Amino acid sequence: MYQIEEKDWKLYREKLPEWQEVYMERLIREYAELLKSDKAASEKFWALDKRIRADRQSLGVRVIEEGRSKLQNILTGLIIEHVVSVDDLQDFSEELRESTSQWIQTYCKNLAE
């Protein structure tokens, strides 16, 4: 298993709040579109309520700076949930990027089975 380097850990702690803000801005734009629809006010209200409840479970909203040992899982989850892309990891070490790619491949393979 890949050992997380201090440089990667510090970079993650720096980038996480930025990633979360960008993700939440995207969610807010999607909520605004939902509210602009021609549906009845009650339908929009309950659809928005349901959506926000679901989005609260997303790593882009709820992840905090957990321990270094969970970094690999968190990055993989953030990519799978489309909070960030593989390109967002370009400043991280090559080892971490490769390890994350392997985790994603394993996840996708398991989904296909």
Question: What is each residue range found by the language model?
Answer:
Residues M1-E113:
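Acidic, Ser/Pro/Thr-rich low-complexity regulatory regions
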